[in-house]
């Protein structure tokens, strides 16, 4: 059983918004195998095989190669992340037939569901400036948020050494939470900020807010966050490589 299977069954059994959000989070993170009409992908262009059901056209994708083979036999495929596929299909008003026919997660996702997922993933954090007055313990953090952060940052291999989640008070009286990343790879700041933003949304706490900052280990605030905050260690790459965040490469063009 795959992570998508487990997330789909949990959403069906639980029935809560949080469980459904978790399914869409797993879908965005999954590596999917898209069924193509042919093997021609020159110039970055691919042609998905489409099926029309009750007036809606669907592309078909599977989270395991064997599932695609069982459904379609030997066929041309393209492998891409769920978030990239959502972007592609939403732009063409296409739905997604996922893991048809016998998988626990088999279902049809209509174009509106993919547009919602694409809008959610396209959200960009806002950059602001504020002067910190006090750093404190983060207090009681909802388990759903901690789980979502663990899942998102678990994919950010090599993008930073560590992070600290703490309570914060700003000049002017505003209070909240801050997640400070230490020794971030240059250029990875936006990817990490988006990962935290998505963790909030997919935990069901999108009305909440976590401020994100990026520090060198020698910065005084890094030591303060280490004293008061909850430490979050990011995965270290197995071998030296240029780190990249998942799903950030440009999607191929549909034809």
Region locations from a protein language model:
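An interfacial alpha-helical scaffold signature
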Residues: 1-255
């Amino acid at each position: 059983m795959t992570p998508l299977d487990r997330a789909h069954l949990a959403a069906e059994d639980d029935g809560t918004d949080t469980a459904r959000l978790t399914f869409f989070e797993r879908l965005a993170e999954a590596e999917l195998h898209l069924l193509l009409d042919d093997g021609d992908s020159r110039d970055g262009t691919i042609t998905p095989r489409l099926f029309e059901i009750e007036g809606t056209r669907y592309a078909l994708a599977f989270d395991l190669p064997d599932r695609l083979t069982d459904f379609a036999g030997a066929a041309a495929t393209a492998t891409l992340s769920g978030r990239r596929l959502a972007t592609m299909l939403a732009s063409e008003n296409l739905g997604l037939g996922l893991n048809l026919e016998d998988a626990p997660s088999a279902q049809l996702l209509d174009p509106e569901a993919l547009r919602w997922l694409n809008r959610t993933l396209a959200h960009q954090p806002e950059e602001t400036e504020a002067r910190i007055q006090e750093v404190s313990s983060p207090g009681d953090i909802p388990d759903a948020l901690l789980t979502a952060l663990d899942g998102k940052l678990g994919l950010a291999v090599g993008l930073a050494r560590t992070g600290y989640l703490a309570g914060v008070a700003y000049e002017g009286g505003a209070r909240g939470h801050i997640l400070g990343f230490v020794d971030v790879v240059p250029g990875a700041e936006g990817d990490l900020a988006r990962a935290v933003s998505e963790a909030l949304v997919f935990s069901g706490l999108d009305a909440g807010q976590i401020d994100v900052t990026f520090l060198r280990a020698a910065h005084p605030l890094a030591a303060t966050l280490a004293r008061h905050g909850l430490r979050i260690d990011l995965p270290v790459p197995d071998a030296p490589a240029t780190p990249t965040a998942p799903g950030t490469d440009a999607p191929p063009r549909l034809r």
